[in-house]
Amino acid sequence: MQNQGFEPGTCIPDGMRHSCSLAKAKLPEPISALEPFKDRLHIITGLHGIHTSPSHSAFFGALGGYRGSDGVPPSASTIDYELSKALPDTLLPHLCIGMDSLENMKTKPTVANLSASGAGQPIFMHSNPNHLYQTLYGGISQGEIRKQHEARSGMLERIGQLAAAKGGTLPLSDKQRYGEFVGGFEDMNGLRERLGKVSDHLRNFAPKVDARYSSPEFETDWHDVLLDLGISSLKSGITNVLTIGSGRGEIFGSWKGLGIEKQGHNLGHMTQKDNPIWIKIRQYNSQMLVKIMEELESVPEGSGTMMDNTLIVYTSNNADKQHTNGANWPVMLLGNCDGIFKSGCFTHVEGKRPINTLYSTILRSVGVSCDRFNMSEKMAKKFDSGSGPLKEILA
């Protein structure tokens, strides 16, 4: 999920106006890294998110398909969380990582802007790779990482015990909120115990810690190792669902490691097509997508590989651009989830179909009966000209 918008001109091959195969097309420079993987790529335009109010960002609404805004809590769960519920149980149902400037990642190592488990229940993104490494692999580490992990674990366990013991005297109006607070500590302590039980297995997947963790020269050093941690969590089976927020769902972001001096809100005030700055950012994104695919391709699963059973969704929390009304919300799919989705093609969705339709289609692919995702019939009369799954993207 890249912030600042995803202009269609940065992903649609020149001259392509109607739905067709990508086989004989040349991908635009920003996504040229995906050229060898065209047969697994599906470029989609024509979906809309007008109802999400995505001008600076739809925030939780980008993955929830509802109106979102800065500082406004989620009004319902998001597609990534619902997927994590539908897929087989894992040690950590859902992992979110967020990439930003070094300063922002250090001062705010966790933020919640994109994912939610329900109304008023945001899911936080991890932005400090040192903290995330300790969480996932601290129990199998040595030296200072192990010491920090044990100290943190002891502290969290003690806080959890104290919190659980002290809540009984609170007024009824505060008990639910306090219960969620206590539940957070129980979740963290429970995860640590579950990870500890499979420590031998995890040793095969833990990334090597290097200077980029403790002494990053640029923010992209942390972006790269966060990606490594996310990939390792998929390969090891720690989680089945990974959400990556590049820009963390806000209007900020920095890529000085790519030679880009401009950062933050100004990046959204420029045209992306044929813009050297955005070519670099989108190429960096595309290289990350390639790395995910290649890593998952290396893991046997069933009669094929993990990538054969994976669907990667690439889009923006700003639809097509900053200050947009969300009338066109471009999406790229990579992989076909064992033949469920079409690939190797470009599709322009006709009519008035919201991003919710894509999300309900994805849920159906994992066995969840869902005609409309987070959209009432009353809302659908205004924002959806069809019903049911998005047939144009199904094989």
Where are these regions (language model features)?
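Ligand-binding pockets and gating/stacking loops
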Residues: M1-A395
